[in-house]
Design a protein with these regions (language model features):
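Amphipathic alpha-helical packing segments from all-alpha helical-bundle domains
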Residues: 40-43, 57-61, 77-103
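Helix-turn-helix
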Residues: 1-15
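Hydrophobic/aromatic-rich alpha-helical bundle segments in the mid-to-C-terminal region
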Residues: 80-85, 102-159
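Hydrophobic alpha-helical connector segments
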Residues: 15, 19, 26-63, 115-119
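Secondary-structure edge/capping motif, primarily at the C-terminal ends of alpha-helices
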Residues: 31, 35, 73, 130-133
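Short helix-capping/turn signature of helix-turn-helix
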Residues: 6, 58, 68-76
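Hydrophobic/aromatic residues within well-ordered alpha-helical segments
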Residues: 9, 16, 20, 24, ...
Length: 159
């Protein structure tokens, strides 16, 4: 019955990404969390990313499926090919809908696009490493990258 509604296995997997993976752990979820840095008038981008990493650490199986689909998505015939090709732009556009508290030295959110891209790239790499042996702690590993991507002293009061 489910396949009749969805069509095929690839469409089911696509729905898992678009309707589940992308639907949770969002900036809105962070804003509603009340955690430090989640002020809707200016959220902390590094704090949001820590929230996202912690959230992703709780859904390892889904994250693993996402990584497999992302790899398969290199094929132009894959149903998620266009999605993964556009993902950096989609993430940028989505994050740009929110107010972020960014250090003046950075020049505001409009100058954050390369940093957002680097964060996505670093997270992809850390998540791949997280799936391998010996085990690492996803969150602790992200914190090491955070210090490099959001250096002191510029980001000290914006974490």
């Amino acid at each position: 019955g489910l396949l009749h509604y969805i069509g095929n296995k690839e469409n089911l997997l696509s729905m898992l990404v678009t309707d589940n993976y992308d639907a949770y752990g969002t900036p809105r979820d962070f804003m509603e969390s009340g955690l430090p840095g989640s002020d809707p008038n200016g959220m902390s981008f590094p704090a949001y990313l820590r929230f996202l990493v912690r959230y992703n650490a709780k859904r390892q199986s889904l994250l693993q499926l996402y990584m497999v689909l992302e790899s398969e998505g290199f094929s132009p015939e894959h149903p998620l090919h266009d999605y993964f090709e556009e993902r950096p732009n989609l993430v940028w556009e989505h994050y740009s809908e929110y107010q972020w508290n960014i250090p003046p030295e950075v020049g505001g959110w409009r100058n954050m696009r390369p940093t957002v891209r680097m964060c996505l790239e670093a997270m992809d790499g850390i998540q791949l490493r997280w799936m391998r042996k010996p085990p690492i702690d996803l969150y602790d590993e992200w914190l090491l990258f955070e210090r490099i991507i959001f250096p002191s002293p510029v980001w000290d009061n914006y974490r």
